[in-house]
């Protein structure tokens, strides 16, 4: 196996968004339910890069009657990444797993559906130096399960689909990978009753199980 493609959220890291969801609306001067309802509407465009984060905040401020205010957009972006970074943590098995792959010469790409804040989050958590590439939907212009984001990851790493293993907590995204001929592991942390998803992915309970697949 030449490469491992890893999802970010709930695969290698998790975030507690409580403070994020409490503080940003106060800073924006918008009720939390109104702000995050509008965030939900524009989330697909933020995720696939059609809308930048700055443009997204500007849209929300204008739509909710609090804009345009360029200085507030900047403040929201800065505070947002601060709160996101403070709330994020890696699962305990991530660093040893990634270090072990690098020691074996297995290339690593983080393949995430996300907005542009997540590059900073991965850097703050120390993931960036452990990976060969960050393949983010907002930069690629396509989100999982689209084949384009998987193809981009393979291209960046210089490996074939048959030489890669994809790990994600979302079975639909795993199916997107297997449709391209990439082996997939559906990571189900703490859910012993989960069944194998459609599409040929293998259910695993931890990254130790993934390591065993890479050795097979």
Question: What are the roles of these predicted feature ranges?
Answer:
Residues 1-6, 95, 99-100, 109-216:
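Asp-based, Mg2+/Mn2+-dependent phosphohydrolase catalytic module
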């Amino acid at each position: 196996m030449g490469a491992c493609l890893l999802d970010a959220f709930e695969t290698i890291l998790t975030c507690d968004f409580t403070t994020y969801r409490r503080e940003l609306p106060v800073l924006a001067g918008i009720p939390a339910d109104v702000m995050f309802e509008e965030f939900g509407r524009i989330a697909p465009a933020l995720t696939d890069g059609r809308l930048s984060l700055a443009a997204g905040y500007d849209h929300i401020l204008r739509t909710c009657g609090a804009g345009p205010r360029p200085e507030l957009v900047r403040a929201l972006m800065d505070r947002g990444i601060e709160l996101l970074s403070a709330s994020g943590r890696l699962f305990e098995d991530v660093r040893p797993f990634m270090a072990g792959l690098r020691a074996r010469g297995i290339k690593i790409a983080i393949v995430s559906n996300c907005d542009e804040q997540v590059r900073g989050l991965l850097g703050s958590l120390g993931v960036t130096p452990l990976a060969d590439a960050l393949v983010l939907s907002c930069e690629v212009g396509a989100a999982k399960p689209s084949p384009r984001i998987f193809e981009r990851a393979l291209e960046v790493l210089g490996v074939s689909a048959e030489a890669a293993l994809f790990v994600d907590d979302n079975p639909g995204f795993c199916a997107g990978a297997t449709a391209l001929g990439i082996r997939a592991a559906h990571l189900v942390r703490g859910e012993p009753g989960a069944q194998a998803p459609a599409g040929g992915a293998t259910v695993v309970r931890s990254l130790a199980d993934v390591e065993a697949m890479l050795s097979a």
